[in-house]
């Protein structure tokens, strides 16, 4: 069973608006940006075991890419997976549902910041 989650969503907003809202969503969840490139619409972030006061059990890392579908529409594709104690991708022994929970919360925060 793969522990990584890949999800893609489309929004009727410009790619810059989605990128800014995504960074706010990461900050709202207590994530740490590892890398960001506004020109290409990409960023990577890590999240601790504890998010919004809830202990999930595993650290996670997310990479996202925002692309413009049209002038007023864009798509965000995210990949999220659990990390071990020293920051490597966890290939086995991860707790079930952690990645799904983080991606669900991320999209909820993203949509809140987009004003959906």
Please state what every model-predicted region is:
Residues 1-116:
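Ser/Thr-rich, low-complexity intrinsically disordered terminal regions
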